[in-house]
A protein has these predicted regions:
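Short hydrophobic/Thr-rich beta-strand motif most characteristic of the beta2 strand and flanking loop
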Residues: 26-33, 41
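Hydrophobic/aromatic residues positioned on beta-strands within the core alpha/beta folds
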Residues: 80-82
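Receiver (REC) domain active-site loop signature in two-component systems and cognate sites
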Residues: 56
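Short amphipathic alpha-helix used as the core "switch/output" element in two-component signaling
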Residues: 40, 62-74
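Charged docking surfaces used in two-component/phosphorelay signaling
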Residues: 16-24
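Acidic catalytic/metal-coordinating carboxylates
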Residues: 33-37, 60-63
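Alpha4 helix (beta4-alpha4-beta5 surface) of REC/receiver domains from two-component response regulators
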Residues: 63, 84-104, 111, 115
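Active-site residues of response regulator receiver
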Residues: 53
Length: 138
């Protein structure tokens, strides 16, 4: 299916894994390791979809979502967070309130993220917002 995806995450290993998964699925990928760079790249590259972590140094994902939703044609957004079960769920709920099209709790399967992304770009939701899992790989 493809499309252009901007991935924003301060975890270099996860950023690499997500980039590879999207590239293998036929997406063009732009990556940023913090919210400030992500906002700048979103403006320069006009992605179809932004996948952003919530808890990051510099500008958090919440700030990035706010900024990206203020442009004339905002991208679709998937917010991800692994900030503990209760706190992570609060962050994801707030991200949804601010305009994230979908949310996904860490840990997640890359195939799940790619499938959700394809659905969001196509204009639907893969499934109701995903709540934190109780076990890795769940």
């Amino acid at each position: 299916m493809g499309g252009r995806v901007l991935i924003i995450d301060d975890d270099p290993a996860l950023l690499r894994l997500m980039s590879m998964a999207f590239q293998q699925a036929g997406f063009g990928v732009v990556a940023a390791d913090n919210g400030r760079k992500g906002i700048r790249l979103a403006s320069a590259h006009r992605p179809d979809l932004v996948v952003t972590d919530i808890v990051m140094p510099d500008i958090e994902g919440i700030g990035a979502i706010r900024a990206m939703k203020q442009v004339a044609r905002p991208p679709k957004i998937i917010a991800i967070s692994g900030a503990g079960r209760a706190r992570g769920a609060d962050y994801l709920s707030w991200a949804k309130h601010l305009g994230a099209d979908e949310v996904l709790a860490k840990p997640f399967r890359m195939s799940e993220l790619v499938k959700m992304s394809q659905s969001v770009i196509a204009g639907g939701a893969a499934h109701p917002s995903v709540q934190p899992q109780t076990a890795l790989g769940g």
